[in-house]
Design a protein with these regions (language model features):
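Sec-dependent signal peptide recognition
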Residues: 4-10
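Hydrophobic h-region of N-terminal signal peptides that target proteins for export
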Residues: 13-21
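N-terminal propeptides/leader regions of secreted preproproteins
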Residues: 24-127
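Trp- and S/T/G-rich repeat-edge/linker motifs of beta-rich repeat architectures
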Residues: 110, 114-190, 210-298, 305-309, ...
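Entry beta-strands of beta-propeller and related beta-repeat scaffolds
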Residues: 201-204, 307-313, 317, 365-369, ...
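Short loop/turn segments immediately following the C-termini of beta-strands
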Residues: 207-209, 315-317, 372-374, 422-424, ...
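C-terminal outer-membrane/trafficking sorting elements
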Residues: 699-779
Length: 779
């Protein structure tokens, strides 16, 4: 009996650390604790609020010495103190050695007290009362994989001279040889970053190795908080070589020695998929200014189309260091002629320099785009541009509206242009901005002194914390059923790096873990009506606020947001759903594509990463592999919660986000993002989703693999198989069906000379072991 009393006392000491001591700093006299009969009603009431499983899980995570049987007994003891007198007997039978168990509890009591007091309340806040949408069983979906980032390198190790990059992709034989020599497959292309439909063709553009963009200040470096990563680092999912990379030394270092750190950033690619033929062309331009601008480019973040011209644009790479080199890269393509018109850095739009772009919008037959700009007075802010050009002179843009924030999203609602503003420019608030009524002739050019558009909502009105609003951005504007919807992007992967900058040296300390959990945010989801009345659909009634900037104390408080969510908690109920990245209306329903960061946490927690903090957070939050990958949600009614079409990236857990939607015919095309360059199915994917208007079931998705990529280059066409198999033949026919040429493949490629067909349109048929693909081609 004495042994049990000691056990109860030790347990009570740990339990009360989270219940009473955190409230009034009360202490418990262990000598007065005789057993369950001594538990006051006040304490038992508080204990009822403590979820047993999560409390014991915290103790287990923070002390791996706690064996499974011990944790079962500990769970029984907690339940016993709550008044469940049968729970203890059931658990005690598995732990006959009470003395050994008491030693473990003593150890835990000495070590875990600060974690129970500082970490456990935030842990409970994050995990409790979360429900997620149901799976959609009311429609039939057919989902095909149309294209995917090629394996374009075999990675042998950081700085290894054998790490040779081939943007056209490697053959099956080359991949097999590299694997046999101890290498790993690598997908350098990460995001399908911009996408647009032109008739029956889908155009898209990419970025590469996104977690490494910006060199050592890149987003992925937050997985190594406080460490020097300038020589590169690697975990089980991705690698950044930085200044050790051979590509950087040969390409970026040739421009300036300081640019070697951008070794992981390759030239982005541009593709065109013909939905009628099933063939995709790599239309990336080359030579002269094209090469220069593609090299000095973080990636092509956007694609837009109007009056025969397709635009691709993105921020400069070397400009990410700020200063005079800040700029952008834009490319114009003649969709009718099938050739590029030119490129431009957009550095002089009436004296204003464009530094970033994300979205385009066509309204009343007028093309607009939203940008970040350094205006001619040197101010960093946002602008809406209108296109006045044509194929002969595509670079005619005018500023038709100013905003205090970078224009990240834009669309027309209720006769006005609405903007999703990012706090990356002068106005450090993420917000929704409303422009003036759009006249019949469209928005007109304005001078630099024209008043900025009105801000109607800010994220800071919801989140009162001092830090998290700075990395939570407006995302995905979409009009649906008479209201404007948007989500948020919570760049939570930067939190570990922020913790290091805030002076936390030991990332496993209770203070550091509390900082990481307290700053963690999930995407909230909103809508507004024509009277600017804002509703919170998914979000929080309370959010953690860090007290140190206010009082100097490293503590946390839950503060009311002023909103009550209609459908559930932020993240659509998921802890690591950080981004409502893009939206589209399809068959009258609202589709929402997300980014889920669980696989990022898993990678950072891997053995190669070496930071125990990530593993602790992973174990606390219950990260599971079956949840890896983006979510796609379908909203059929504004008054009902959405349902999941998928919550695991269509079965590809490495695809962590949906970046783009576009409609072509009766299909929804989905462009995904994955920065996991060392994973077998890493890199971007292009999916096609077809949904019957009326359906009764969800069928297992079928996958249609892309057959052929091709690229025109120097009077020739280079064909390569999308899956790496050998090309058997390439046949050329005239439009009457007569054979003009048959060429045999060389491995997974085949090149034909197009000089004999100059000025003609022919039919080309490519045959591989997997099938054949035919298309008309004009030369």
């Amino acid at each position: 009996m004495k042994m049990k009393k000691k056990l109860f006392s030790l347990l009570l000491m740990a339990v009360t650390a989270v219940t009473l001591s955190a409230q009034e700093q009360k202490s418990v006299n262990l000598n007065e604790v005789e057993g369950i009969e001594n538990v006051s009603e006040e304490l038992r009431t508080e204990l009822e609020k403590v979820p047993t499983d999560q409390f014991v899980n915290l103790l287990k995570v923070m002390n791996p010495a706690l064996k499974s049987a011990d944790s079962e007994l500990l769970s029984g003891l907690v339940e016993y103190y709550k008044g469940n007198t049968t729970a203890l007997a059931a658990a005690a039978s598995s732990t006959p050695d009470y003395e050994a168990f008491i030693d473990v509890i003593k150890q835990i009591s000495g070590q875990v007290g600060p974690y129970v007091q500082k970490v456990f309340p935030l842990y409970l806040y994050i995990m409790n009362n979360r429900t997620i949408p149901d799976m959609d069983i009311y429609a039939k979906y057919d989902i095909d994989t149309i294209a995917a980032a090629p394996v374009d390198e075999i990675f042998y190790g950081i700085g290894d001279e054998r790490n040779n990059y081939n943007p056209m992709g490697l053959s099956e034989a080359e991949i097999a040889e590299g694997l046999a020599q101890g290498g790993q497959v690598k997908h350098n292309q990460a995001y399908l970053w911009g996408m647009v439909t032109v008739g029956s063709k889908v155009y898209w553009c990419t970025n590469t190795n996104y977690l490494c963009v910006g060199g050592t200040s890149g987003l992925g470096s937050n997985s190594k908080p406080g460490e020097d990563v300038s020589k590169g680092y690697k975990n089980k999912c991705w690698v950044c070589e930085f200044e050790s990379g051979t590509y950087g030394k040969k390409v970026h270092g040739a421009v300036s020695p300081e640019y070697v750190q951008y070794s992981d950033t390759r030239m982005p690619r541009i593709y065109c998929y013909d939905t009628k033929t099933g063939m995709a062309e790599d239309i990336t331009p080359s030579g002269g200014d094209y090469d220069r601008m593609l090299q000095d480019c973080q990636g092509l973040r956007s694609a837009g189309y109007h009056k025969g011209v397709v635009f691709f644009g993105g921020p400069s790479l070397y400009g990410s260091t700020a200063g005079e080199t800040v700029g952008s890269s834009f490319f114009a393509y003649d969709a009718d002629a099938g050739k590029f018109i030119g490129c431009n850095d957009m550095s002089n739009i009436d004296g204003n320099k464009i530094t970033d772009i994300r979205r385009w919008c066509v309204h009343n037959d007028i093309l607009y785009c939203g940008v970040r700009v350094t205006d001619r007075n040197g101010r960093d802010r946002g602008a809406v541009l209108r296109w006045y050009g044509d194929k002969e002179n595509p670079w005619q843009f005018k500023v038709v509206g100013w905003t205090a924030n970078e224009v990240a999203e834009l669309c027309v609602f209720n006769g006005r242009m609405y903007v999703g503003g990012w706090a990356t420019a002068s106005e450090k608030r993420n917000c929704i901005v409303k422009g003036p009524m759009i006249p019949t002739r469209g928005l007109q050019p304005v001078d630099i002194d024209e008043p900025e558009w009105d801000i109607i909502w800010t994220y800071n009105s919801y989140d009162k914390n001092s830090i998290s609003p700075n990395f939570t951005y407006t995302a995905g504007l979409q009009v649906w059923n008479g209201k404007l919807y948007w989500g948020m992007f919570c760049a939570s992967y930067i939190i570990p790096g922020l913790a290091s900058k805030m002076g936390y040296k030991d990332m496993t300390s209770p203070e550091a873990l509390a900082f990481i959990l307290g700053q963690l945010r999930q995407t909230s989801f909103w809508r507004v009506n024509s009277r600017d009345n804002v509703e919170l659909l998914y979000g929080e009634e309370e959010l953690p606020v860090w007290n140190r900037p206010l009082t100097g104390e490293d503590t946390w408080s839950l503060v009311k947001t002023g909103y009550t969510p209609i459908f559930g908690r932020a993240g659509f109920g998921q802890v690591f759903t950080a981004y409502a990245w893009t939206m589209a209306e399809y068959h009258n329903d609202l589709y929402v594509g997300t980014m889920n960061m669980e696989n990022l946490l898993d990678a950072a927690a891997s053995e190669e990463s070496g930071n125990q903090m990530f593993n602790i957070v992973k174990l606390l939050t219950g990260v599971k592999e079956e949840n890896y990958g983006f979510e796609l949600l379908r909203w059929t009614s504004p008054n009902k919660a959405p349902r999941y079409v998928t919550k695991n990236g269509f079965g590809n857990g490495t695809a962590y986000g949906i970046r783009n939607f576009t409609l072509a015919g009766d299909d929804l095309y989905i462009g995904s993002a994955s920065p996991f360059n060392l994973q077998k199915y890493g890199g971007w994917h292009l999916f096609r989703l077809h949904s019957d208007a009326i359906g009764t079931s969800v069928e297992t998705a079928t996958t249609k693999e892309l057959g052929i990529y091709f690229r025109r280059y120097n009077g020739a066409v280079i064909f390569s198989s999308a899956n790496g198999e050998d090309i058997k033949t390439v046949e050329v026919f005239d439009l009457g069906g007569s054979s003009l040429e048959t060429s045999e493949g060389s491995g997974n490629t085949c090149t034909i000379d197009t000089t004999p067909y100059s000025g003609r349109t022919v039919v080309v048929k490519v045959t591989t072991a997997r099938g054949n693909w035919s298309a008309k081609m004009a030369f």
